[in-house]
């Protein structure tokens, strides 16, 4: 077993989810590649006296289900999984697929059925507000190809950023959080960009390995109607 996998599993259980004895955790595995990590998460869950529940899916199987998906089907699936999710204290979701565009040809209306009738009740209404959750991807050849590098090189990069000391990072973020929370006006200046806005009384939220791995940001939002200026994007954007 790769020691880096053991470290990641330990951090997910102890730091991200802070699992305690008797708590129940839903471990969602998408793809076969994350299995070594999922097995280690199960072991670590048992070590703390918590109870693991595992559900596994692949993009290719989900594609076949979605191509013929009906509202009745998605409602029943949601009803079953809502009952399970309501009993969970935590959720760990790991995705690792070979083909990142496996579901590219699934009709939009089928995706919409899943989003409305399954994802919304199970995840948005129960999992997100009522469990300790963390989600991440597992390194695969598809991800390495997207990064234009070898799998080994990508794995090194992946574990270096996923196995950071996020507790230490969170402590270091406090100074930025304090600064942002007492700031009113913000101005961003770069090539072809000069934009200003207010963040007064908008909370600054730090993200340090609690819900996403890898992680590392402090975010806020501008006060509505306070934005003025010009911004230029270096990549295509819907907006």
Which residue stretches match the model-derived regions?
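Active-site bordering "gate/hinge" segments
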Residues: 1-230, 235-239
